[in-house]
């Protein structure tokens, strides 16, 4: 049996080994590893690269600065990072496969001053991330979710999941490519998912050709401003 890991590498397993528990991080079967408190299994290789909460927060700061350099993403507005269990993630994202989820709450208040009305908008941005993610996977997921944050602020609510997720996957892929993590990029290109995989294959070549601002203009009609 041949299995592809999340880093795009292929691994051959005998029938017995292929039936072992699969690591939630790299998706490969493994005999040796550890069971997390929420029943996720993590192989020894991924466990050795897992980030502590402090390291995860530092990576988020560095990644925001990198995406600001690459595409002009804001790097200063407050984003709360919450490291949570698999069960909590399923409730927040409504997806059993999700490794991360960006939630943006918008509170609008309108004030009347004489004959004029003034509207204030308060944004509350929270990035939910699974605990114990290895460094590269954590960066990949956060780059995706930070793109959601940018789209919320500058485009609005996405009307076409393939376009919205495709843009987020494309930015994540561009970050991975900039760091020479080409195996992860290849895995994204081969992803059979009709939303994430197909969206990436649609948007990534256009991102390289037109740039991020060009992508926003081309797909502006796919979003509804808040």
Predicted regions: what is each one?
Residues 67, 140-154, 165-169:
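Active-site recognition of the HExxH zinc-binding catalytic motif
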Residues 15-34, 193-226:
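Pan-zinc metallopeptidase signature
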Residues 56-59, 138-139, 143, 160, ...:
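Hydrophobic (often cysteine-bearing) scaffold residues that line and stabilize catalytic clefts
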């Amino acid at each position: 049996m041949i299995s592809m890991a999340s880093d795009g590498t292929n691994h051959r397993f005998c029938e017995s080994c292929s039936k072992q528990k699969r690591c939630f991080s790299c998706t490969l079967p493994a005999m040796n590893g550890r069971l997390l408190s929420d029943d996720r299994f993590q192989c020894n290789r991924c466990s050795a690269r897992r980030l502590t909460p402090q390291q995860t927060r530092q990576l988020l700061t560095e990644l925001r600065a990198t995406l600001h350099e690459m595409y002009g993403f804001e790097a200063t507005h407050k984003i709360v990072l919450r490291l949570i269990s698999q069960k909590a993630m399923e409730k927040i994202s409504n997806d059993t496969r999700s490794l991360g989820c960006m939630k943006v709450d918008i509170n609008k208040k309108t004030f009347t001053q004489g004959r004029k009305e003034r509207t204030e908008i308060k944004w509350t941005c929270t990035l939910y991330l699974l605990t114990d993610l290895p460094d590269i996977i954590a960066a990949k997921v956060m780059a995706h979710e930070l793109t959601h944050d940018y789209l919320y602020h500058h485009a609005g609510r996405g009307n076409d999941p393939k376009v919205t997720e495709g843009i987020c996957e494309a930015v994540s892929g561009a970050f991975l490519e900039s760091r020479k993590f080409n195996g992860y990029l290849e895995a994204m290109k081969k992803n059979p998912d009709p939303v994430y995989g197909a969206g990436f294959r649609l948007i990534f070549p256009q991102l390289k050709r037109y740039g991020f601002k060009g992508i926003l203009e081309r797909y502006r009609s796919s979003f509804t401003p808040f």
